[in-house]
Amino acid sequence: MLKVFETMNKATHHIFQVLTKRPQRLFEMKNDIDWSENIWIGTTVESEKYIYRIKYIEEIPARVKFLSLEPLLGPINNINLNGIDWVIVGGESGFASRPVKKEWIIDIKDMCKVKNIPFFFKQWGGVNRKKAGKELDGKIFTEMPAKSTTRNNKLTTACFLF
C-alpha cells in the first residue's frame, strides 16, 4: 500500500480522492505516508452505526478530508464535522436499493451550511439513478472544497478497499 501512496505523491499533476471504509488502517500508517497536497482522504459513513470512522480521518494529516455519506441508509444526527473539508451524499442505487429520505439529506446539507463545508449531492439512487436525478429542492449541489481550486490539477478518483 505504501508503494501506491509513493506513486500518488509523484503524480502531483493529479488529485487523488482516496475513499475507504477502513480508515483505521490509514490512521495506523499515517506517519509512514507522505501526505502531499494532491492526496485527499475520505471515509464512507452510511448510517450512524459508522460515525466512529470519522475520528480516524480527523487525525490523518491529509490536506483535504472528506466524508462520503453514500449510500445514505438512515438519518445521521449531530455528526461532528470539525476538520472535514467536504461532504458527499447520495442514495443507494441498483436492484433492491433501499430508499433515501429527503429529510436525511436536508439535515446533512444544513449541517454543512452551518459549518461552511461544501456539500455535494450525488444522486437520489434507485434502480434507475439517471431517471431519479440529483436535484434537491430544484437545485443541483456540486460544491467542491475551496482547497481544490488553488491547484491546476486533473481530478482523479482512486478508491481503495483496504
Label every model-predicted segment.
Residues 73, 78-162:
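Auxiliary Fe-S-binding modules of radical SAM enzymes
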Residues 1-29, 33-74, 85-100:
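Core AdoMet radical
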